[in-house]
């Protein structure tokens, strides 16, 4: 059994990850919050035996094998390195870090320590995206030439905090949502982005110069161009992912979501057909793969390197939106 410590008494851990760890046969043994009162209440609410107030206390606990980091973005790098130094496996929320040097250091140190580092890019675990990846690899749409991502959502009131008003914490829609688009596109297309252009704005939610909406285009190594629209402000939009090829199109609807839902339609000269899907909890799939990787079987659903790629893409989109120019995507890996 893999025993987990939570770095951050977060909403995502409470709503998704704690249950996924338990469903995958693991146990959550400790939670760290800088507030002792919050940590103790969170532990009691979620059936966790220990609550601590420092990262060192959590990663120094011999009962902890792996940590899940879901604090604000500027804390990820230091907390991950502390866990890696202590010999703990690390599953970290995106973005891995605030800059590429820190992200690459996390990957390097995990490799040197012989521990597993994963990025919690949940969307590549969706049955919809896996079916699209398989269909493309099988040649069912011919050569991919373009893609479109619709990932404009409404940020619920209980999450309308640092994402909207703390630039120093890595707030804004690009580092929160666009990084997911980048990872999903890399996974589905089995291709890497090399260039970004974008325009961002604030429609009233984003403060302190932070964007709450962005549209842009990524150019991939193969020549595919991918359009994306991300926002915190759209209450009634539908999410989706489309990939268009020389011999067909894949139309994914309601697929950019944490829930195991959505449909994928293959459209070609023969007509339309809905791809069969085996919907499963995305986070349970991710944790099961992470447990297997700890045991020496396979790799995490999204590795540390995958997290660096999505970070590099997000940072390029931020720069492109700020400068109005095309920005090359380089990872430093």
Curated annotation (Swiss-Prot):
Which InterPro entries does the entry link to?
Gfo/Idh/MocA-like_OxRdtase_N, Gfo/Idh/MocA_domain, GFO_IDH_MocA-like_dom, NAD(P)-bd_dom_sf
Q: Which GO terms describe its molecular function?
A: 1,5-anhydro-D-fructose reductase (1,5-anhydro-D-mannitol-forming) activity; nucleotide binding
Q: Which UniProt keywords apply?
A: NADP, Oxidoreductase
Which superkingdom is the protein from?
A: Bacteria
Q: Where does NADP(+) bind?
A: 9-12, 33-34, 38, 71-76, 93-94, 120, 162-163, 283
What is the reaction catalyzed?
1,5-anhydro-D-mannitol + NADP(+) = 1,5-anhydro-D-fructose + NADPH + H(+)
EC number annotated for this UniProt entry? 1.1.1.292
| One Pfam family in the UniProt entry | GFO_IDH_MocA_C3
Question: Which PANTHER family does the record match to this protein?
Answer: OXIDOREDUCTASES, TRANS-1,2-DIHYDROBENZENE-1,2-DIOL DEHYDROGENASE
Q: Which family does it belong to?
A: Belongs to the Gfo/Idh/MocA family.
Assembly, per entry: Monomer.
Described function: Catalyzes the NADPH-specific reduction of 1,5-anhydro-D-fructose to 1,5-anhydro-D-mannitol.
Q: What is this protein called?
A: 1,5-anhydro-D-fructose reductase
């Amino acid at each position: 059994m893999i025993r987990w410590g939570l770095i951050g008494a977060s909403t995502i851990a409470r709503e998704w990850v704690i249950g996924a760890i338990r469903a995958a046969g693991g146990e959550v043994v400790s939670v760290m919050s800088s507030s002792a009162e919050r940590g103790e209440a969170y532990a009691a609410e979620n059936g966790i035996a220990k609550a601590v107030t420092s990262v060192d206390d959590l990663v120094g606990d011999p009962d902890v094998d792996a940590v899940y980091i879901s604090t604000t973005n500027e804390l990820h790098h230091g907390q991950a390195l502390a866990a890696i130094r202590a010999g703990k496996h690390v599953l970290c929320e995106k973005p891995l870090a605030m800059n590429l040097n820190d992200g690459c250091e996390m990957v390097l140190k995990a490799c040197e320590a012989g521990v597993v580092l994963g990025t919690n890019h949940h969307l590549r675990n969706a049955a919809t995206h896996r079916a699209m990846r398989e269909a493309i690899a099988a040649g069912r749409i011919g050569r991919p030439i373009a893609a479109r991502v619709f990932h404009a959502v409404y940020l619920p009131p209980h999450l309308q905090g640092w994402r909207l008003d703390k630039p120093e914490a890595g707030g804004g829609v690009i580092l929160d949502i666009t990084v997911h688009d980048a990872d999903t596109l890399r996974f589905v297309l089995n291709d890497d982005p090399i260039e970004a252009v974008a325009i961002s704005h604030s429609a009233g939610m984003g403060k302190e110069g932070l964007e709450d909406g962005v549209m842009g285009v990524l150019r991939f190594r193969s020549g595919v161009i991918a359009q994306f629209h991300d926002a915190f402000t759209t209450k009634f939009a539908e999410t989706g992912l489309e990939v268009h090829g020389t011999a067909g199109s894949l139309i994914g609807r309601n697929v950019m979501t944490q829930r195991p839902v959505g449909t994928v339609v293959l459209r070609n000269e023969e007509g339309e057909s809905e791809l069969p899907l085996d919907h499963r909890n995305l986070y349970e799939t991710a944790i099961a793969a992470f447990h297997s990787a700890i045991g020496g079987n396979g790799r995490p659903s999204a590795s540390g390197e995958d997290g660096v790629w999505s970070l590099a893409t997000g940072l390029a989109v931020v720069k492109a939106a700020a400068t109005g120019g095309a920005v090359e995507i380089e990872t430093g890996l």
